[in-house]
Design a protein with these regions (language model features):
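Positively charged n-region of N-terminal signal peptides that target proteins for export
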Residues: 1-6
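C-terminal motif of bacterial Sec signal peptides marking the signal peptidase cleavage site
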Residues: 18-20
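Conserved functional acidic sites
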Residues: 24-232
Length: 232
């Protein structure tokens, strides 16, 4: 039943893309760094990332644009290797700021997070972006605050699958705080991640400082290829 539901979820943006959008050239961003962000295409693309430190763990990012009464925006859905959706980011195409952020708990219940700071991708490379969102915690009565502060480090040519591509490299300071509003107690964990955004692709690689976690883009799948994987 869950896989049928996922299949219908995957099918909907394809139908919207056919009837609601003409082609990818309909969408342009005012962000001067948009070439290094995800393609603004109404036809969904699925990025398969593999954890090269272990060679086993996979993660899928499903990327597509839609247009509604609020205008065009880009959706990035994050899936675990078993097909469970984990979170989804909704970006405004003009600025590439976040419009919405959705989280999914272990029971696959979706929650629209409360967005405090909406910048994950910079308009200008000399700015430090700040993303902050609050949502329900794993334990009853707790809430979680997720933050990412991103700083541009350098531009380089980087290997993306089999080709060298111009790439923006960022340092991401990531902080997750668990808050109990009744006891006023909080517990925070912080880490630093290095992220790589390549021209024409968007996010192609990320790793922790010690590279114990290290994901790299391995393949770009079509919608049909993705459906075969997720429903088999």
């Amino acid at each position: 039943m869950m896989r049928l539901g996922v299949f219908l979820l995957l099918l909907l943006p394809t139908v919207l893309g056919i009837y609601g959008c003409s082609n990818a050239s309909d969408y342009t961003s005012e962000n001067p760094n948009a070439a290094f962000f995800y393609p603004l295409d109404s036809i969904p693309k699925i990025y398969l990332y593999r954890d090269v430190s272990s060679g086993l763990d996979e993660e899928f990012h499903r990327i597509y644009t839609v247009k509604d009464q609020e205008g065009p925006h880009l959706i990035v859905e994050i899936y675990a290797s078993d097909g469970r959706i984990k979170e989804a980011f909704n970006y405004n195409i003009d600025s590439l700021n976040l419009q919405d952020y959705m989280v999914v708990d272990v029971n696959q219940e979706k929650e629209k997070a409360l967005l405090y700071k909406d910048k994950l991708f910079p308009m200008h490379l000399n700015e430090r972006t700040w993303f902050a969102a609050k949502f329900k915690g794993v334990v009853d009565s707790t809430v979680m605050l997720s933050e990412v502060k991103r700083q541009f480090k350098r531009k380089e040519n980087h290997l993306v699958m089999e080709d060298e591509e111009p790439t923006l490299v960022f340092s991401d300071l990531m902080r997750l705080t668990v808050l109990n509003p009744f006891t006023k107690k909080e517990e925070a964990k912080q880490t630093t991640r290095i992220s790589y955004f390549a021209d024409g692709y968007g996010l192609v690689e990320w790793h922790s400082i010690n590279k114990k976690v290290h994901y790299r883009l391995e393949q770009v799948l079509t919608q049909q290829e993705w459906i075969k994987i997720i429903t088999r």
